[in-house]
Amino acid sequence: MRALRDTSDILVIGAGIVGVSTAIWLQRSGVSVTLIDRDEPGSATSYGNAGILASASVIPVPTPGIIKKVPGMLLNPNKALFLKWSQLPRLLPFFYKYLLNSNSDSVFKISNALSYILYDTVEQHLEISKGTNAENYITTNDLIFGYSDKIAFENDSYSWDLKQKHGHKFSSLSRADLAKYDKNLKNKFGFAVKCMNHGTISDPGVYISELFKSFVNKGGKFLKAEVKDILFDNFRNPIYLNTNNGDISCNKIVLTAGVWSAGLAKKLGVKIPLTSERGYHVEYHSPNIEFKAPVVISDSKFIIHSMQGRLRCAGLVEFGGIFQPESSHPFKLIEKKIETLFPQLKYERKTYWMGHRPSTTDSLPVIDISPNYNNVWLGYGHQHIGLSAGPKTGKILSEIILSKNTNRDLSRFSASRDGLIK
């Protein structure tokens, strides 16, 4: 089959928030870019998230003490951690390295790196969306964490102390304070925490679609195709992408395909442990309740967020790979909790979604040039923070590619960093 000629300077594989952001920042620097994805831009993992620009999400899932808690959590259907047991043998090597990073020293280093990429998330989103229709979907807001009582909050003191060390501001709310803040939260939680300086996206899928439209309107191109392989010349430069629509010629490539990056990365000789932390959401359409700010249900680890015309309840963690069907238990947990907390909730219909968060063993993304091939860059592995960190990751990648801001220390996001490859 004859190769299709692409005249763009750079091809970006993956059109979620990271890929679209990378394409936009490259385009704004005068580079011609083609985005490639098997799906429509922003329609996969970037679509179904909770819509939070979470500057304070600097705590990884594995923290001190979790190793003792995991068995009980997995065996309790009312806890927020799930596992497709058939996948356990395949996941054991990942879990071993993943849980090794739950010690306090590792968590502190990881939180430092997460803080760097998240502290200005709202500003980064405002900057990339400025002058586009996407900016209409961004709002600065608080983020509320609801607890059954103050003791439950104090049991989370490790995480809150670490957030405070990174400069994140929050205030406590009593039951009465919470009722004054939002009447819909009256008598729902015995204690709460209000985090300031966060942001929300009222419709993540449409938001990313609008960013993509601005990219296309300024000359960017999009190819709907599934990339199967990358072919190189004798000098380790990419020359073709092998896709289900034929071979596409190329000179420079950026790999930003989320959890689906793993297969192509292996072909590049990049041995980064990567798996899917599957997330779930239930949406209640045309609800009779609208919340002032998103609320984290702390004991169930999901967020309720009033979006445009619907209430999205999103979160949880399931380790189950990318090929297994969705599970019913996560949906049931969300529904049961919502029915218990808000029996007055009325709605027209419910919809269900499951997506794949790409997670590395140290909970940090890879933002780097390929260590083995020229003119190939990597940007994936953002676990729960993909939406929040997408624009900044795209800006960093564009600067690496164009040799700008070379004094930036990106060793913590290296494809060959200590603690990731063993």
Where are these regions (language model features)?
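Active-site substrate-recognition segment that forms the wall
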Residues: 51-52, 57-101, 229-232, 237-238, ...
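Rossmann-like flavin
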Residues: 92-213
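A conserved short coil-to-beta-strand element within the FAD-binding core of flavoproteins
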Residues: 173-181, 223-238
